[in-house]
Regions:
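Non-heme Fe(II)/2-oxoglutarate
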Residues: 1-38, 75
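Short helix-terminating capping/connector loops at secondary-structure junctions
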Residues: 16, 125-126
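Catalytic core of non-heme Fe(II) oxygenases with the double-stranded beta-helix
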Residues: 25-109, 119, 126-129, 141, ...
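Short, charged beta-turn/beta-strand-edge "cap" motif at the junction between a beta-strand
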Residues: 114-117
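Double-stranded beta-helix
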Residues: 133-149
Length: 149
């Protein structure tokens, strides 16, 4: 009898889960200067976001000013994401976002555990300013009935 009651509660949790509110878990502002970079990292929570408030360069000028201007992959000023390829075994895929002045007042939302980094910029003495944060589920209203209920 107890097993069937537990199975019934499990069925209710799967098909009628408690609602979870999505909340901002953390919020911060980044001020990045010329030559600075943000190394590869990920975040806490479920989703993260970046809002590009001020980007002090145009990508065309940035790529020309970069010390890697003759490199095969010049990523000056880019935001880059890293993830496993389709076979999920060893191939790492990369997506580079050329976030320049045209991205101002725009944003990105991505899974928090997605590794990413920000490359340095070289063509401006102004700050790159972004607002970033993490969304997390608020489960404070969840209750557990337990196997004895």
């Amino acid at each position: 009898i107890k097993v069937s009651k537990l199975a019934e509660q499990f069925k209710l949790r799967i098909f009628n889960p408690y609602p979870l509110d999505l909340r901002i878990g953390s919020l911060w502002v980044n001020f990045q200067k010329k030559y600075e970079f943000n190394p590869i990292h990920d975040h806490d929570g479920v989703f993260s976001f970046i809002i590009f408030m001020k980007i002090p360069f145009i990508m065309e000028d940035e790529l020309k000013a970069s010390p890697g201007k003759n490199a095969k992959h010049n990523l000056a000023g880019h935001l880059q994401f890293f993830f496993l390829g389709e076979n999920q075994q060893s191939h790492i895929e990369k997506i580079a976002i050329p976030a320049d002045k045209t991205w101002e007042k725009r944003g990105l939302i991505f899974r928090s555990h997605l590794n990413h980094m920000v490359y340095p910029f070289y063509s401006s003495d102004d700050y790159r300013v972004t607002i970033s944060g993490n969304f997390a589920f608020d489960n404070s209203n969840m209750r557990y009935d337990g196997p004895n209920n």
